[in-house]
Amino acid sequence: MGFGCNAAGVVATRIINSPREKLIAIITNNFSLCNGRWGTQILMATLFIGTLVNRHWSSLVSMLAVVSIVILGIGLSFFTSWLLSKTLLKGESSFFTLELPPYRPPKFWQTLYTSLIDRTLIILGRAITFAIPAGAVIWLISNIYFDGQSLALWFIQNLDNFGIFLGLNGVILLAYILAIPANEIVIPTILMLTSLVLGNNQGAGILFETEDSEIAKMLTNSGWTTLTAINLMLFSLLHNPCSTTIYTIYQETKSKKWTAIATILPLIYGFIICFLVTKIWNLIS
């Protein structure tokens, strides 16, 4: 279920009886690309990876690039599950027993209520609770100025060196900080901040959409390369969960320790892998 929504995936671990294996499932859930991250993957693959080959093959190459990220996420999920089961969460593996109960007529209204109220509206309410303040923060840092410079530009400049060290940039890092409430706003936030860096008035705290060709031109003009796009695809897979998922993890585990581990572990993976990819890319290019 994590491929649809990581928060829903965390809730779905309630069916696991073993507390140890439930924790492992919760921690590795973030390695599934949720709905909010597919847009970033597809856009980067289309604009930067697909353009490396003949246009007849560009769609196939773009698709394979996205599939590769998904496979990497699955591989890291298996690896992390194995690592946790040998270190922090040692213990005997439980057995899965499938019991077929007697047939009963479906309880339509009860199922509808449970699915709509308990599964959908509560998660949606949490998302709205975190997303509304995020919109206010994005607007404020873009429109509050000190010494003729907006707070957003100040943050970008201070994050830029670390971002370039990872094969990313300050815009991407700030966008992910601002987009903690929802992965869906990562690309609009990147475009807004990039427009701000380039000196366009369109980006003053307003999330906007534009054509793919204009996006490619804007990103290229601000120094983006194929390496930047690849690392963004990797970082989109390997970064902290959104705030709704973090809150849901805490609600399910009732533990600040495991919530912190589930939040920080993907970020550590992201930093390490982006750094290694950047070093290898620079060596062979």
Predicted regions and their residues:
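Alpha-helical transmembrane segments
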Residues: 62-80
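Extended, low-charge hydrophobic alpha-helical regions
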Residues: 9-25, 135-267
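Core transmembrane alpha-helical segments of multi-pass membrane transporters/permeases
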Residues: 95, 99, 108-143, 172
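Juxtamembrane inter-helical linkers in multi-pass membrane proteins
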Residues: 1-8, 90-115, 163, 194, ...
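Hydrophobic alpha-helical transmembrane segments in multi-pass membrane proteins
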Residues: 37-38, 42, 122-139, 187-188, ...
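Transmembrane helix-loop junctions at the membrane interface of multipass transporters and ion channels
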Residues: 17, 38-64, 247-255, 276-285
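Juxtamembrane/interface segments at transmembrane-helix termini
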Residues: 80-95, 146-147, 250, 281-285
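Final/C-terminal transmembrane alpha-helix of multipass membrane proteins
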Residues: 261-281
